[in-house]
């Protein structure tokens, strides 16, 4: 992004911030809690950007003063040296701030702030793939707990030999989608299964879909498009087990999506949860379609976000996790223990780098 474009966008952000300040002082806005919350949230989002822009303006002024001092000190070598050092430090601070502001102005995914549903499905590899799906679920649970997110399994189909054929996990928290969206795709594991007597390495896979939570207004579902039936939920022994039909089997005819929900205690809760899952799945389909159209015009994403894309291999023998989008290796134990900060951070950095390159190319055009 060239300097003139950067300043223009920063001035626009500054004007928007000042306008929001005026709106917050308006009694009519103060009397409307919903509008007040919306305006206050947008003001909070812009405040760090505007503050950094003001810092940049101050540093630019100090740079001009330092340059003037360098010229005035040519007859005094010691003073000139001090002035040049001061100018060098100011220029360094200025460049760092410009970099920070440029990143802050990069296009944001409007869904980045949302909570998500993670759908993990066992792929190729039979029983070992089911065990691997369970390992991935625990990895994300540990990562979410570290960040203070609320991580809760809401639907699952257990496998006979352990692990899961599929599992849907609700992950609620701040900016969850902005991080976990890079986890969508095929996760491949290479290891010796516990049942392997010859010590041979097997390759298994599991797919991860990352679905941002959808608002009912955002994804409209017609009641005529649904087929809903109830079933008895299984569970540990007891007089009430299987006597009340609390499970919900929901089928969306236009998309062919089926959701079976048994985790909640009541039929109404399971129905609400099933509808929540269905909305997220339908939104994921919309996003996938939009991404496919966008990729035909440009290829600037870190990965496609498609659940069929092979994104990572976990090699137990070499204690190595390879992210194929980045071409970078990470320690296996670190990743599986839920320490995904380095991996996801590298994906975010690569995405920002590509976005900046695209903006630069647009400026040249």
From Swiss-Prot:
Methylated by PrmC. Methylation increases the termination efficiency of RF1. InterPro entries: PCRF, Pep_chain_release_fac_I, Pep_chain_release_fac_I_sf, Prokaryotic/Mito_RF, RF-1. Coiled coil: none annotated. The modification N5-methylglutamine is found at residue 239. One of its GO terms (cellular component) is cytoplasm. GO terms for molecular function: translation release factor activity, codon specific. It is found in: Cytoplasm. Its main location: cytoplasm. Keywords: Cytoplasm, Methylation, Protein biosynthesis. Peptide chain release factor 1 directs the termination of translation in response to the peptide chain termination codons UAG and UAA. This is Peptide chain release factor 1. The gene is prfA.
